[in-house]
């Protein structure tokens, strides 16, 4: 007979957990026979005593198997089922371009995304800015969209990795979110439940990253690569910069417009392009759709320049209930803020540093994110034309623009952004891409 308290005692005493015990514990989490207090005690024991790679693999697979696991074989797809996941940040709109780009190159991308968390924007919130777009279709509609279009971006359902949903909710209120072992299992259980052949992980580094230090970001990346591969899914990770907003804008409708501009060739900001291409190229190599990164980049640029990637995005939007002419007339459908004001620089100088987390929180304060789960989002608000590290700005020239619902909210955001920028005599832009793991 399985006794949760004895299982918890093992980890408390730094003893190894076996696969059967982990599976039994996760089954108890799912059926409710393991109490909230026992989940909390287990999470704290793991936080202090950690899990080995084998234990992490076992926990990940048990959480995957706690609900539905999508199987794409019956659809007889003619390409690999692959995806990208990001630890999140500010202005990280990569998913909206990467999915269609990879689909246009022969991949199938069933991307299950999340809402905003803390200062980070959520891909699901961005897509919800598109009128009519259904982020929670039923499984059949999701599978049809992936089969017919090659990409569908939706939200997590209660039937995918339900044990993880319960464990995460308890970790969130028991000061155990920061456990690399449990973050790894949380991310990968959902990705494995989506039936992926391969995954590329985008792990952010810097002031707007989820992990506070570069060392911790690298530790998380290594854990995800080791556990993903240990669970039978080809997995690599790329460490990318989040010391400033990735796109020159932040905010839901504004980022959708940015993604459309990128796909149609109207504007491809350099740092955003570098990260999007690096992740997309690695995904093509992972899925066997390109011989090497150079071959992958050539295929991706062809997909962009021919309009094939933009066409996949348009088809995905239509397949999931959005407007058929969004690519051609985004301004007709995307909400626009009532107030748009510049953020004047308080002095002349070169941007040396940006508090990226503060930029994200400024968007949340404008109404573009949530402080409580039940909060409604104002999709129109955000920031645009943000100055980059290494860029020279003259006094009273704009560091960016605030899009707000009213003048009071705009004034508060202007002050926050001015305080988020540090200007000096000189400043060098940080690398966009730090390293690849796996």
Swiss-Prot record:
Gene3D superfamilies: Nucleoside phosphorylase/phosphoribosyltransferase catalytic domain (3.40.1030.10), Pyrimidine nucleoside phosphorylase-like, C-terminal domain (3.90.1170.30), Transferase, Pyrimidine Nucleoside Phosphorylase, Chain C (1.20.970.10)
Disulfide feature: none
InterPro entries with a match to the protein in the record: Glycosyl_Trfase_fam3, Glycosyl_Trfase_fam3_N_dom, Glycosyl_Trfase_fam3_N_dom_sf, Nuc_phospho_transferase, PYNP-like_C_sf, PYNP_C, Pyrmidine_PPas_bac/euk, Pyrmidine_PPase_CS
Pfam family, one: PYNP_C
Record-level GO BP terms: pyrimidine nucleobase metabolic process; thymidine metabolic process
The keyword Transferase appears for this protein: yes
Record-listed E.C. numbers: 2.4.2.4
NCBIfam families membership: PRK05820.1, T_phosphoryl, Y_phosphoryl
Assembly and binders: Homodimer.
Designated name of the protein: Thymidine phosphorylase
Native organism: Burkholderia lata (strain ATCC 17760 / DSM 23089 / LMG 22485 / NCIMB 9086 / R18194 / 383)
């Amino acid at each position: 007979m399985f006794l949760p308290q004895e299982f918890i005692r093992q980890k408390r005493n730094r003893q190894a957990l076996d696969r059967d015990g982990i599976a039994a514990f996760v089954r108890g989490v799912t059926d409710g026979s393991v109490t909230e207090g026992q989940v909390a005690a287990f999470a704290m024991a793991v936080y202090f005593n950690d899990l080995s790679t084998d234990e992490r693999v076992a926990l990940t697979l048990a959480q995957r198997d706690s609900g539905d696991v999508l199987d794409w074989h019956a659809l007889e797809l003619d390409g690999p089922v692959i995806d990208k996941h990001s630890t999140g940040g500010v202005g990280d709109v990569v998913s909206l371009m990467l999915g269609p780009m990879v689909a246009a190159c022969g991949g199938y991308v069933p991307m299950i995304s999340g809402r905003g968390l803390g200062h980070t924007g959520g891909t699901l919130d961005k897509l919800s800015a598109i009128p009519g777009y259904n982020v929670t279709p039923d499984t059949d509609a999701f599978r049809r969209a992936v089969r017919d279009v090659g990409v569908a971006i939706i939200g997590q359902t209660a039937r995918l990795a339900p044990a993880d949903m319960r464990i995460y909710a308890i970790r969130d209120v028991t000061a155990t979110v920061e456990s690399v072992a449990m973050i790894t299992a949380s991310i990968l259980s959902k990705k494995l439940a989506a039936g992926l052949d391969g995954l590329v992980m985008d792990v952010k580094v810097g002031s707007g990253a989820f992990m506070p230090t570069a060392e911790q970001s690298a530790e998380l990346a290594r854990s995800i690569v080791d556990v993903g591969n240990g669970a039978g899914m080809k997995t690599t990770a790329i460490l990318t910069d989040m010391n400033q907003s990735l796109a020159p804008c932040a905010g839901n409708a504004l980022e959708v417009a940015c993604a459309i501009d990128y796909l149609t060739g109207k504007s491809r900001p350099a740092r955003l392009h570098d990260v999007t291409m690096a992740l997309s190229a690695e995904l093509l190599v992972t899925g066997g759709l390109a011989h090497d990164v150079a071959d992958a980049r050539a295929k991706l640029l062809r997909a962009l320049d021919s309009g094939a990637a933009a066409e996949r995005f348009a088809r995905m939007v239509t397949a999931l209930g959005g407007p058929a002419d969004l690519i051609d007339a985004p301004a007709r459908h995307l909400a626009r803020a009532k107030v748009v004001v510049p953020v004047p620089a308080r002095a002349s100088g070169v941007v040396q540093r940006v508090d990226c987390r503060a930029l994200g929180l400024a968007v949340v304060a404008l109404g573009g994110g949530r402080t409580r789960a039940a909060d409604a989002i104002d999709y129109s608000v955000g920031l645009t034309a943000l100055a980059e590290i290494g860029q020279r700005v003259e006094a009273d020239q704009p560091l960016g623009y605030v899009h707000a619902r009213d003048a009071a909210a705009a004034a508060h955001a202007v002050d926050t952004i001015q305080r988020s920028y540090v200007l000096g005599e000189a400043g060098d832009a940080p690398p966009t891409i730090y390293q690849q793991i796996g």
